[in-house]
C-alpha cells in the first residue's frame, strides 16, 4: 500500500512542479528484472507455503542485499534513488541482526503473534534487536484509515525515495528540453 501511495505522491509532486508523465519513459534502469526478482522472492517468502520453510528468510535477506547493491549502482544514474538504497540498507541491517527476519510490533503482527514467525517476519520481543528500526509504524494510526500494515523507518525512507525518483524523473526531461532550447536559440 505504501509503495502505491509513494508513486501517487511522486506523480502529484511531478505534476505540481510542471513535470511530464511521459518523461518517466526516459528512466533507464540496468537489470530491472533484479528488482522484480527480489519482489517475487519477498512475496513467495510471505504468501506461499515456502513461508513455513526454515531458511527462506535467508534467501530474502540475500535478495534484499542484492537490491541495496543495485540501488547503489544506480545512484549516479537515477536522481533520488539514494533514498531507496538508504531505506533498503536500514532494513537489511535489522534483518541481518535478527537472523534473517524483520521484527514486527505485536499489536501489528496479526496471525504472526500465534506462530512466532512467518517467512521473513518475527514478532518483536526483548530478544529481537534494533527494534526501533523494525516494523512498528502503522500509517493507519497516523491518518486514521486504511489497512493495518506495519512499516519500518527504512520502509518509509524507501517510499520517500520512490516518490522522489518519480517526481524528479518527471522533471528531468523538462529541464533537459529547456536547456536544449536555450543553447539552440540564436542570440
Question: PLM features: what roles do these ranges have?
Answer:
Residues 55-62, 150-160:
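Membrane-interface loop-to-helix entry segments
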Residues 104-150:
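Extracytosolic (periplasmic/ER-lumenal) interhelical loops and adjacent juxtamembrane/interface segments
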Residues 1, 175-187:
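Actinobacteria-biased recognition of intrinsically disordered, low-complexity terminal regions
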Residues 52, 78-84, 101-110:
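A cytosolic-side transmembrane-helix exit/cap motif
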Residues 12-21, 69-78, 164-173:
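Structural signal for the C-terminal ends of transmembrane alpha-helices
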Residues 9, 37-44, 62-65, 86-93, ...:
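Lipid-exposed faces of alpha-helical membrane segments in multi-pass integral membrane proteins
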Amino acid at each position: 500500500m505504501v509503495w502505491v501511495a509513494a508513486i501517487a505522491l511522486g506523480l502529484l509532486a511531478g505534476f505540481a512542479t510542471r513535470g511530464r508523465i511521459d518523461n518517466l519513459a526516459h528512466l533507464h534502469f540496468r537489470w530491472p528484472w533484479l528488482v522484480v526478482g527480489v519482489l517475487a522472492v519477498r512475496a513467495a517468502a510471505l504468501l506461499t507455503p515456502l513461508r513455513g520453510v526454515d531458511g527462506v528468510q535467508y534467501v530474502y535477506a540475500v535478495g534484499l542485499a542484492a537490491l541495496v547493491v543495485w540501488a547503489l549502482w544506480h545512484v549516479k544514474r537515477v536522481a533520488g534513488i539514494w533514498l531507496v538504497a538508504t531505506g533498503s540498507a536500514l532494513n537489511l541491517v535489522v534483518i541481518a541482526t535478527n537472523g534473517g527476519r524483520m521484527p514486527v510490533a505485536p499489536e501489528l503482527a496479526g496471525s504472526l503473534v500465534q506462530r512466532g514467525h512467518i517467512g521473513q517476519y518475527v514478532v518483536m520481543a526483548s530478544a529481537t534487536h534494533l527494534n526501533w528500526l523494525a516494523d512498528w509504524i502503522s500509517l493507519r494510526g497516523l491518518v486514521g484509515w486504511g489497512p493495518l500494515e506495519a512499516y519500518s523507518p527504512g520502509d518509509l525512507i524507501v517510499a520517500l525515495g520512490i516518490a522522489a525518483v518519480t517526481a524528479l524523473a518527471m522533471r528531468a526531461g523538462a529541464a533537459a528540453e529547456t536547456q536544449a532550447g536555450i543553447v539552440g536559440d540564436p542570440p
